[in-house]
Amino acid sequence: MSFPNSSPAANTFLVDSLISACRSDSFYSSSASMYMPPPSADMGTYGMQTCGLLPSLAKREVNHQNMGMNVHPYIPQVDSWTDPNRSCRIEQPVTQQVPTCSFTTNIKEESNCCMYSDKRNKLISAEVPSYQRLVPEPCPVENPEVPVPGYFRLSQTYATGKTQEYNNSPEGSSTVMLQLNPRGAAKPQLSAAQLQMEKKMNEPANGQEPTKVSQVESPEAKGGLPEERSCLAEVSVSSPEVQEKESKEEIKSDTPTSNWLTAKSGRKKRCPYTKHQTLELEKEFLFNMYLTRERRLEISKSVNLTDRQVKIWFQNRRMKLKKMSRENRIRELTANLTFX
């Protein structure tokens, strides 16, 4: 890259020529500290004119000392960027200080302020000395604290309520954590409360589980229809095998290994059907999976069940068949696959 002359004014624009996106090859005069690209015949006016800041230069026009900056309404701060004596901006040193800002009186300030007070400002200024050149001092406001919007604000009722509720906490740092992080502050206390609840649930679980199970199952049997109660009576008289199965399940539930977390191994049915009833229903299901209302009424009379019970049995049987067919299909697919 060749420069026409090695004047100090030309050296000042070296950084600008490398950084600026609107500039290509160098063309500047030694008389005025001005830098513009040479206009070519193909592209016409090129360079800073596209930015809308400087007027274009015609060919062989060198005398542009009095050229000014056009200020447009969408860039109102252009005047403050440039020096009054120069028509183009020179890079300023890094140590330029940001002017101190002040809040206007017509802006509404929040009543509750940020938790970072004067102590926090002193700590920040002591810990980060490298930023003192850019931000020399905090903005002067009437209050020394910075106003924060409402969604960042700490609710004072939350803090006082939590500290009163958990007065027995030995650590004094919990209040500081509550101020800095209101969401995560109550986690240790909540975990302790959960542990106490689990202990209370675990202690009576081993001794009182069979009684709870009987109490839960008895209202289900009592709340059924009178026809279902008659069905229960018929089942208890006609099928002693079902009673033996239920007694075995109760014995299994009495073992100390089963607690309130684990469910029972077997499912106690509310109204199990007899062998004769299931046989007749299975025959009808093999003949036809879906029943009409007339056929359902006939079967319910012959098997001594209600219309609703027959309907529910067929629904469950269809779901069972669907599940079995799905499992068989999966088994066949996995059997055909060979894993190397």
Swiss-Prot record:
Keyword Calcium (UniProt): no
Polar residues bias: start-end ranges: 208-217
Biased composition (Basic and acidic residues): 242-253
One MF annotation (Gene Ontology) recorded for this entry: RNA polymerase II cis-regulatory region sequence-specific DNA binding
Modified residues (Phosphoserine): 238-239
InterPro entries on file: HD (IPR001356), HD_metazoa (IPR020479), Homeobox_CS (IPR017970), Homeodomain-like_sf (IPR009057), HXA10/ABDB-like (IPR046333)
Function, as annotated: Sequence-specific transcription factor which is part of a developmental regulatory system that provides cells with specific positional identities on the anterior-posterior axis.
Family: Belongs to the Abd-B homeobox family.
Protein name listed in UniProt: Homeobox protein Hox-D10
Gene name for this UniProt entry: HOXD10
